[in-house]
Amino acid sequence: MELKLNRKYKDTLFRKVFNNKKDLLSLYNALNNTEHMDESLITINTIEGAIYIGYKNDISFIINSELNLYEHQSSVNPNMPVRGLIYFAELYKGYIDQNNLLIYNERLVKLPFPRYVVFYNGTEDEPEEQELRLSDSFEKVLEGEVQRTDIVEAEANKPSVEVAVQLLNINYGCNQELLEKCQKLMEYSRFIALVRVKSDMLTEKYKKEMKSVNKKEIFADAVALAIDEAIRDNVLKDILSKNMAEVTDMLLTEFDEKAYIEGVKKQSYEEGEAKLAKLVVELKKRGRVEDIAKVTDESERERLYKEFNI
């Protein structure tokens, strides 16, 4: 089964909420415990229309010699630092070109300090804050493979490139102090929580009524109810009242993407199970019982896959 997803980019609700400098500055202040009031300090440099690794970042901007990359994600992906590396490279290239910086000159080129923050509001339990690092993706140099005797293992495993991602859980009830510092972030968190409450309520309602309604239809109904209630309660009222259809479309697109990702994971798991079963059969045929116990180790499993051309 081949799974497909329309990769044409659409704005996320998070980006819609923070696409103006006033609210973006409020979010920056909340994160950094600053009190900047001058919106002109912000230079937004999001690479418009650029999709990298199948995703587009939500917002990037420069303020006070800091290059900030903000993303919203509904799932925790350990490859976020890899995507960040690629996107930061593009941002710095643009900055160097725009400012006519001479990187081959003998004078040191000054660049804005990078900060990468991901705002998580998925349904899985995650800590309020965690850090993901690019170096976790790098293959480590084993002690026996260190060729130069003057380099200890710790130094050999010190990467020349690093990207650190600050991952913040903004589900309603998490990081309360941060949410209270930024009104729009609080409202965004409340609205997403409201959509989920309505979705659970409708799922239970249709189940009791024995109605056959698919998940996407339930979600669409939940979004409509959540928007109405949010407007009444003055939650993202300015955005929801003016852009009701657009917001609905954004959330349904995010729903489709989540369903796609879950489908890919399920397919990958099933394919992996079939591959593993084939390997075990081959090992049994050859009487290599001792190797069957080794398949729980990823590196050994991959070695055996290569050996049997699976």
Name these PLM-found stretches.
Residues 1-310:
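Elongated, amphipathic alpha-helical interaction scaffolds
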